[in-house]
């Protein structure tokens, strides 16, 4: 495998291709011989990963590192070749020899090395725009949160496919929205997450391959292929109508990885309905017999490729390598694509369980997904795996060939969910809830009027296109308000504004407000509980459900919040109202399958925030805690087969689950590690305990917190947060902890009988400056609750938060979570946590 980016960029941050493209046979043989020397010298049994730096001008090389284990690139190598490295490594560890290991799905032994008659490309997925102030430069530290793998017959095809797959609104190497680069040479020589698009811009502006090479040090072989794509976009631009484009030109465009969307953009340059024009391109293509072919990936270098079901779609072929016939007993499941902030392994769990249930019921299951990190892209998980795009165009290509009973869009998160109504318009049978109902739930206006019609309360909101309208609306509902711009200039896409100054600053700096780009302003309820309702319904009747609550008050994104199931601290009446509203919505939308509703509750006042007619991030968690597979039930319903109704409720179980979030702020230099309405966590854990303290403590330790040994620093923000933390601070004092606090917090604690040592703010420059003390590791836990959004408060608070992260000191920025954590470790010691397997928790 070869990194597209030069040495200096972490391999996890680099585009990677396989097999190597820019090395000749002699250079490749040299590196292979070196590898054999290394593994024989170390005595490797099993898997090994060696990274080289290689200068092809001088044949000079360096071994960078050797990992005598399965690595991140091992998973990529397995998916790239179809050779199951982990399976073979496990057998070798058990004492088998290579020639004794039969490769899964073929009669061949693992002794045969895989050979590739195709190319693959891995591209990282970054979500840096989620973090205010973060450096976008990429280098030796890994910041990407996911990756994709594309397969094809040419580099041009795989890079264009791959750039569509990363799911950031890009359509390939060319034909994207116009990106602004202040200094293009700077962008090319100091790489950021957008460098590949800076190269596209450079070609547009007439840069030569040599000039780009001198700035980027990316091998000219790759740059030449990218130039081919740019040059062919100019060929397409010469035509005014798609009907005028010769079939040979269309065929070559498709071979170079151009999507129908890109072709429509270059030929027709439509201002209006680009989807309509893309479908026109599709129709003309099909009429001219410019069609894709489906190829197999041979899972070893065997004589029996017909035994494998690992497929990809390409335009560089003349016939399909698999047979096709209409099969009413087949079902297509759309996967979740690249891991990103907001969509991760939870949806892969849902996809895999849907596929397994379909297979159990005798259906031929067909999976479309392109994430090499997932279980759903293991070729033995489904009857057919299309390792390919989840674009509208590609899904239609597969459905045209497979002609299944239908397609499941509700288990892979938002990507497949967004395709539901478009597939419906093409007369594709979508299994489960009707796409028209999905559209009613997804469309803010339709959903809001449905809630009004059903008499269900919701926070007041309005879509506004003038600043005057924004201020009028805020005058009616009062501060704080949640602002969602439709066009974001910089920073987070959503923000809570607590006063007129903040509102004005946010809208001026972060968003455009106009008729074309309206802004949605919602009433924001302070100190309200956020509650999740995960459920499965059949023809509008709720079959099973789970009610879980957030530890944090509303204002922390549900993906970052600490989730407790079953809910421990909500009124019985609140739970009753939530069930009633859930049933009403399920009936009105005639839901058949999974769905999730998010509620706000204050006292017994319950409001609906949103409803998703698909599996949510919390489905695997509640399924595992409750020991009932919600996705299996949902899949059975979608396939019109019998299912088991639960005979117990959420509150019959004698244990508690807590889901805690994992953050990666230490890798994101300069990012402010404070939680808000935009999600920033990159992972999660779920833990079970006999009571809330045990479950919370286990989950917090699992995401990297440690129980403080001696000293805790508290900077508790506004009065409400001070009150929320008071009992917890008393517990710290009673348990012998040293408490340090900033001025206002120290004074408040002293007034209420808690002794704390006062530390000065970062900008005060005194000897007891909190930043000096953080640098000296004087604290075992830092609690910093943002007080308000004034410049001094933000700057001082930011320095404390960032200091804690940079010095690897556990940090909590939410008063309710801090309070719960302190109570948990004061009530229970780490040695008292029981070690129990999941199977030991029994109903």
Task: Locate predicted features.
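ATP-dependent carboxylate activation and anion-phosphoryl transfer catalytic cores
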Residues: 1-257, 276, 292-293, 302, ...
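Extended, domain-scale alpha-helical bundle/helix-rich regions
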Residues: 253-256, 262-269
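Conserved A3 ("GATE") glycine/threonine-rich loop of ANL adenylate-forming enzymes
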Residues: 442-445, 488-492
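Conserved anion/nucleotide-ligand pocket segment
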Residues: 479-486
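ATP-binding N-terminal substructure of ATP-dependent carboxylate-amine bond-forming enzymes
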Residues: 162, 271-274, 284-289, 295-456, ...
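Residues in the recognition helix of alpha-helical DNA-binding motifs
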Residues: 215, 225-226, 266, 280-284
């Amino acid at each position: 495998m070869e990194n597209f980016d030069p040495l200096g960029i972490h391999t996890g941050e680099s585009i990677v291709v396989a097999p190597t493209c820019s090395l000749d046979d002699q250079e490749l043989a040299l590196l292979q011989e070196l590898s054999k020397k290394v593994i024989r010298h170390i005595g490797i049994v099993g898997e090994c990963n060696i990274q080289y730096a290689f200068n092809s001008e001088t044949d000079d090389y360096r071994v960078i590192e050797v990992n005598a284990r399965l690595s991140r690139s091992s998973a990529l190598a397995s998916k790239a070749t179809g050779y199951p490295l982990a399976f073979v490594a496990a057998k070798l560890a058990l004492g088998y020899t290579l020639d004794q290991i039969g490769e899964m799905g073929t009669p061949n032994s693992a002794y045969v090395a895989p050979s590739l008659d195709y190319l693959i490309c891995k591209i990282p997925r970054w979500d840096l725009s989620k973090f205010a102030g973060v450096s976008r430069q990429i280098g030796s530290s890994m910041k990407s949160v996911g990756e994709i793998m594309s397969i094809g017959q040419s580099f041009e095809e795989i890079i264009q496919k791959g750039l569509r797959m990363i799911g950031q609104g890009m359509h390939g190497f060319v034909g994207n929205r116009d990106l602004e680069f202040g200094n293009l040479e700077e962008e090319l020589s100091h790489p950021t997450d957008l460098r590949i698009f800076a190269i596209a811009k450079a070609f547009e502006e007439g840069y030569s391959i040599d000039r780009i090479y001198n700035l980027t040090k990316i091998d000219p072989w790759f740059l030449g292929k990218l130039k081919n794509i740019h040059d062919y976009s100019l060929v397409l631009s010469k035509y005014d109508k798609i009907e005028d484009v010769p079939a040979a030109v269309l065929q070559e465009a498709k071979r170079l990885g151009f999507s129908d969307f890109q072709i429509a953009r270059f030929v027709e340059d439509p201002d209006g309905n680009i989807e309509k024009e893309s479908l026109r391109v599709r129709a003309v293509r099909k009429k001219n017999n410019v069609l894709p072919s489906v190829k197999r990936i041979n899972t070893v270098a065997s004589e029996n490729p017909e035994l494998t079901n690992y497929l990809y779609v390409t335009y560089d072929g003349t016939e399909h390598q698999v047979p096709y016939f209409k099969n009413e007993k087949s079902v297509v499941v759309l996967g979740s694509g690249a891991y990103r902030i907001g969509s991760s392994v939870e949806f892969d769990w849902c996809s895999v369980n849907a596929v397994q249930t379909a297979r159990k019921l005798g259906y031929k299951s067909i999976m479309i997904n392109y994430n090499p990190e997932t279980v759903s892209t293991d070729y033995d998980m489904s009857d057919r795996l299309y390792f390919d795009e989840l674009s509208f165009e590609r899904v239609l290509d597969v459905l045209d060939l497979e002609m299944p009973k239908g397609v499941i869009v509700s288990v892979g998160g938002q990507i497949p969910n967004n395709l539901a109504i478009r597939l419906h318009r093409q007369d594709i049978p979508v299994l489960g809830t009707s796409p028209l109902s999905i559209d009613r739930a997804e469309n803010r206006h339709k959903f809001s009027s449905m809630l009004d019609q059903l008499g269900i309360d919701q926070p007041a909101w309005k879509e506004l296109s003038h600043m005057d309208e924004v201020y009028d609306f805020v005058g009616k509902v009062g501060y704080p308000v949640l602002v969602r711009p439709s066009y974001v200039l910089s920073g987070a896409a959503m923000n809570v504004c607590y006063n007129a100054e903040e509102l004005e600053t946010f809208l001026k700096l972060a968003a455009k407000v106009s008729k074309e780009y309206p802004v949605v302003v919602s009433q924001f309820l302070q100190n309200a509980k956020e509650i999740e309702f995960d459920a499965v319904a059949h023809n509008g009747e709720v079959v099973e459900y789970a009610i879980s609550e957030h530890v944090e008050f509303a204002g922390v994104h549900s993906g970052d919040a600490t989730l407790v199931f079953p809910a421990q601290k909500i009124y019985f009446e609140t739970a009753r109202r939530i069930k009633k509203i859930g049933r009403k919505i399920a009936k009105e939308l005639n839901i058949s399958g999974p769905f999730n509703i998010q509620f706000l509750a204050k006292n017994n006042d319950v409001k609906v925030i949103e409803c998703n007619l698909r599996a949510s991030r919390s489905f695997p968690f509640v399924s595992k805690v409750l020991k009932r597979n919600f996705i299996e039930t949902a899949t059975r319903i979608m396939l019109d087969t019998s299912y088991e109704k639960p005979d117990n409720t959420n509150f019959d179980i004698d244990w508690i689950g807590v889901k805690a979030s994992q953050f990666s702020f230490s890798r994101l230099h300069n990012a402010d590690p404070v939680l808000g309405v935009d999600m920033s966590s990159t992972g999660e854990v779920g833990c079970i305990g006999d009571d809330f303290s045990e479950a919370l403590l286990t989950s917090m330790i699992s995401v990297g917190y440690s129980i403080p040994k001696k000293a805790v620093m508290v900077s508790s923000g506004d009065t409400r947060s001070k009150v929320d933390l008071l009992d917890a601070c008393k517990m710290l004092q009673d348990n012998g902890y040293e408490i340090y606090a900033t001025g206002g917090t120290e004074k408040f604690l002293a007034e209420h009988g808690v002794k704390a040592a006062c530390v000065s703010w970062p900008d005060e420059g005194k000897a007891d400056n909190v930043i000096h003390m953080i640098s000296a590791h004087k604290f075992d836990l830092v609690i910093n609750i943002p007080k308000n959004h004034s410049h001094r408060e933000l700057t001082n608070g930011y320095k404390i938060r960032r200091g804690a992260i940079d010095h690897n000191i556990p940090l909590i920025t939410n008063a309710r979570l801090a309070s719960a954590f302190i109570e948990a470790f004061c009530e229970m010691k780490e040695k008292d946590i029981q070690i129990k397997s999941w199977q030991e928790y029994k109903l």
